[in-house]
């Protein structure tokens, strides 16, 4: 598929993420980044099987932007909607195939750090 990133430089001068600015930036960037991902993957919306969105944890404003967009898109193209735990997704991304590689299995050590929380996980199955 595709891996696209939208960087929010506006937070640099504050030394951390400002929730209101983050949600506004999400609103501005969500359509362009989805168009870029579809283009990079050389697919169209009709080619996808489902719409996944982050249900949390995360900043409320940014989560609302994501779930609202995902629900609208899901309804408009008649595809199922899947809610995903943000932190679990980072750990489980270990199993995703990327170009030229195969995912490795368990056991492995996972580490997530977000908003002042850190988790070190031993994944055995």
Segments predicted by a language model, with ranges:
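Short acidic/glycine-rich loops and adjacent helix/strand connectors
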Residues: 1-125
């Amino acid at each position: 598929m595709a891996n696209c990133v939208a960087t929010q430089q506006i937070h640099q001068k504050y030394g951390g993420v400002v929730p209101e600015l983050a949600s506004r930036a999400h609103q501005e960037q969500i359509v362009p980044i989805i168009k870029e991902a579809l283009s990079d993957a050389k697919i169209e919306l009709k080619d996808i099987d489902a719409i996944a969105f982050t249900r949390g944890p995360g900043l409320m404003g940014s989560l609302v932007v994501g779930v609202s967009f995902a629900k609208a898109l899901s309804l408009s193209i008649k595809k199922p909607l899947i809610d995903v735990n943000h932190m679990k997704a980072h750990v489980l991304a270990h199993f995703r195939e990327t170009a030229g590689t195969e995912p490795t299995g368990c056991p492995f050590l996972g580490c997530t750090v977000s908003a002042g929380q850190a988790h070190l996980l031993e994944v055995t199955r």
